[in-house]
Amino acid sequence: MFALKSVINISAFLGHNSSIQFDECPCPEIACVNKPYVYNPMGYDPDGDSLSYALVYPLGQSALSLANTVYTLPNLVPQNAGSSFGIDPLTGTVFWSNPQMQGEYNFTIKITEWRNGFEIGYVIRDVQLTVTSQCPNNPPSIVAIPDQCVNVDDTLNFVINGSDPNQDFLSISSSGLPFNLASNPATFAFVNGNGYANGVLNWRTTCTHIRQAPYLVNIQLTDNGNPTLSDFESFNIKVRPPELEGLNISAVGNAVNLTWNKPYCNNATGYSVYRKAGAANPTLNCCDNPGIANNLGMTLIHQTSNLNDTVYTDNNNLNIDEKYCYVVTAMYDYDLVESCPTDTVLSLIHI
């Protein structure tokens, strides 16, 4: 008996809430004795909510949990002693290294949907797995994919490669929210072939893609051997807001006046002003180091919550003939995402 259970919360306080989508069918899976097995449901949330993954007890009759019954996880079967079985809670990839005994197995994945730290729904999916010893085929493999970081209005473009030791025909595919966005979705152009396959991910990011959480992308590579085997790789794409520009500063008495340009992304929610006595040397890559102003040893002295508020006067504990350095950043996504600082970070002011 197999079961599928889905729970979704509908609330005026939550706003629109869609159910989790999956691009991989939990059809009967095949694994080989003494060879690594991986599986991923290729899930994403159309609303951009975060997903987490866990292995749970299967559901039995009337969709009741089989906890405290005879059910045993595959790796806890005595004949599979020494093998490891688990799931990546962030990507959903199930791994079994390596099954020792042929037979029929079942495992169940709970995919939980989160928004602003609160659970708002989940899906429970059963997966049937057949482990066979009649397995001349070896699984294909995807070249490891590092996490990516891209600034708004830049284009992310790179190749993903996969190969097969048996020279079987390979098919490569992608899944994730970036490919299902209403505005400027990512594309994945692929070439399938014997022993080798590749895909080119291309994404021209825009202001609407700015958010705190990275975008998870899953890649699947499947051969046509006997039995058919697959490999999965997951990676994150972080989309960074544009650098704030046009900071001008002038000393008037024992105060400093600051003005700056509004960002071209009009979904900014406000600004943060930082100050440091002496110079600041920006040697860090802002895309890879969010919060770079703090990394420069600067102190937050002012925050605004209005896109049009681009003027500030600093008259707080400034010393005569002291040199000060200022930067301003724009805030996005309910002040959870901070832009790169203004390009005049090295300006020095005499009071």
Where are these regions (language model features)?
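Extracellular acidic, Ser/Thr/Pro-rich low-complexity tracts
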Residues: 42-49, 160-168, 207, 221-223, ...
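Extracellular interdomain linkers/hinges and stalk-like, low-complexity segments
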Residues: 2-48, 118-165, 227-246, 251-255, ...
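Recognizes extended acidic, P/S/T-rich segments that occur
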Residues: 272-319
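Short, solvent-exposed loop/turn segments at the edges of extracellular beta-sandwich modules
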Residues: 112-120, 221-228, 331-337
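Beta-strand-rich modules
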Residues: 314-335
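Conserved small/polar residues in nucleotide/adenosyl-binding loops
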Residues: 349-351
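Conserved aromatic anchor
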Residues: 203, 254-268
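Strand-loop-strand motifs at the edges of beta-sheets in extracellular beta-sandwich domains
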Residues: 74-99, 184-206
